[in-house]
Amino acid sequence: ATSNVFSMFDQSQIQEFKEAFTMIDANRDGFIDQEDLKDTYASLGRGIKDERIRDMLAESSGPVNFQIFLGLFGDKLSGTDPEETILEAFKILDADNKGVINKNYLAEIMMTQADRFSQSEVNQMFDISPIDVAGNLDYKSLCYIITHGQEEE
């Protein structure tokens, strides 16, 4: 990842990545390390195994500073379709890899983290979302609806 990584994104995207990087870099040393990732998952109410964190960090060629962070996202996002990108974002919140996320948990995350959606915006999303009787949102179906405009037949 060289300085041309910045040409992959527009200024607003770079700013959003910078905000995300700053949130994850808990100790504010300019690098994302194992402890930063553990703290981030803990703040989201999720545990994560050390092995999984090591796997994530192994994707970079060295210490993860902002430029490397941006490059990792550039690599992940280049050649992916919007549906896959949205799906990957939901998968981060699905620690058990069941394909569903509790709607109350999702609402809390959406209204308290990063872009902070309003209750009205979250309700609009839930209005078009497949949610089961236990209150779990089927995010794979929601991704399809978001990118194609209707549920799969």
UniProtKB/Swiss-Prot annotation:
Keyword Manganese belongs to the record: no
Against PROSITE patterns, the record matches this protein to: EF_HAND_1 (PS00018), EF_HAND_2 (PS50222)
Q: Which GO terms describe its molecular function?
A: calcium ion binding
Residues that bind Ca(2+):
25, 27, 29, 36
GO cellular component terms, alphabetically, are:
myosin complex
Q: Where does the EF-hand domain lie? A: 12-47, 81-116, 117-152
The protein depicted here goes by the name: Myosin regulatory light chain, smooth muscle
Q: Which keywords describe this protein according to UniProt?
A: Calcium, Metal-binding, Motor protein, Muscle protein, Myosin, Repeat
What's the further remark here? This chain binds calcium.
